[in-house]
Amino acid sequence: MRKRFFAGFAASVLAAGIMAAVPMSAGAEASRAVDTNKFEFDKYLIMDSDAQVPNVSFTYTIAPGTAVAANNIKAGPEGAKFTDGTATKTITFSSSDTVVNDDDYDTRMTIDFDGEHGNEKAAVKALEIDFSEVDFPDPGIYRYVLTEATTTDAAVTYDEAPAKYLDVIVTADETTHDPVIASKILHYTKVTDKGEEDVKVTGFNNTYNTNDLAFEKAVSGNQASKNKYFKFNVKITPAAGAYEPADTYSFKVTGSHDRTVDADDATYSKATINAANDFTTLTYAQLKAGKDVYLKAGQKLIIEDLPTGIGYQITETKEDYTPTIAVDNGDNEGFTADNDAATATDTSLTENTVIKFTNNKGGAIPTGVIVAVAVPAALSLVGFIGVVTILVKRRKDNTEG
């Protein structure tokens, strides 16, 4: 599991506990008013800069923590809820959510970008906890635990600390002397000793993992045509229990395939090729159903940012060629190539993959053709040499005479 340095760790917010106690949601003003009985934290879903925000869900629970005598921390009283009145909250991301780029965001948000500017973005959702029904008996520090439920889905890497520790600092009101909330601090880990490193955060970091799938066409042999189009069908096969995008979720498609052609192919009509190839994105529904595409030698199709762990099948319509399939990532245990069926299959896409379909068409040139051409050619050559010899001899005789 990768481990990154928090992009906002060096920011001043992490040097000041009170500021860290008030997370900043995307687009929020630094001076915004916050209800002292409420605590807001963020959910950051990091992904490739070209990926569409997936419709993936995450679930959180708020519960009283345990007392830490060494730090004078008390267990939080019951009653803390999310603003919908429940102790468990599920959120679902969508393409309409706020997105911040890794080279232009409020660094007070502790987003776990990889540090390479321009290649990542994060969708941001805010969650709010309500302490208005909590009875804090005395001034002090009260601890709660925020926990994120995790799964084994390959498409999502969860926060390395699925439990965060929320300390609520309670003081006495200057007028009534009643206990009131002064501030709140969210800790990355459970701090139980005064000497431990204390990292303050503004929320949870998860990563949406994606990979590119590409396939390309090549031909070989002395009878192979480099201008001929070959028909392919690419189909996505989701694994049981794995993350599955919405049918309308779209994937960017790049590469070098002809989106339109001007004339009929030897096998396929211009209308057929143009109807199949004229696209720059494909929806999840199209890929589940299977999408036809036509490629000729030297062309490649790339489907970008498929969710990691998803399966696929690419099949080439067989013709009077001998197909051979090769993949550039041989470590992928789920990949199989059936040359007889001209089909490449993978039960789980786990890295960027390029599959090469090579069709061979060759054969021996008939020897009778060679003999028929070679005999007259040899006779012509003999005649030519004879003429040259006679001319040279005559010239020599004339010179001597």
Residue ranges and their predicted role:
Residues 2-401:
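Solvent-exposed loop/turn and edge beta-strand elements of beta-rich ligand-binding domains
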